[in-house]
Amino acid sequence: MLYTEKEKNEIERVRKVFEKHIQQMTGYDLVWSDKVGYVWLAISIDPIYIDTGNWIESAASLCYECLNDIALDVFGMTGNDHDFEDADPLELAEIKRRWKPYIAQLPEYAYICDELLSGRK
């Protein structure tokens, strides 16, 4: 078995919390492989291609990928080509606002928000 039953159940719980977001993502997808388990794929829809894949080794790693994608959406929305380290206060406020409903359902993963934000100068 790729994951213990407990690990698989926890990954599934995180996946369900982010399910709508995952379905709406255009730059990434989460797929199941019988060989390795969950894989986070960097994709493009127009033109169609698959770039890279990262193995989702735990519920925390899935939560990290989803929270990071939400932040990247904000950076894309503002048209700024940067990451957390150069984020302005309005971008940070919007990122935190978008994270809030997910972290409310997954409070044990709130530390991931801090890890992502620790990339700030």
Feature names for model-found ranges:
Residues 2-36:
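Negatively charged, low-complexity tracts enriched in Asp/Glu with abundant Ser/Thr
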Residues 11, 15, 25, 99-102, ...:
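Long amphipathic alpha-helices with heptad-repeat character
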Residues 32-106:
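Acidic, low-complexity, intrinsically disordered interaction modules
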Residues 118-121:
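Short acidic DE-rich linear segments
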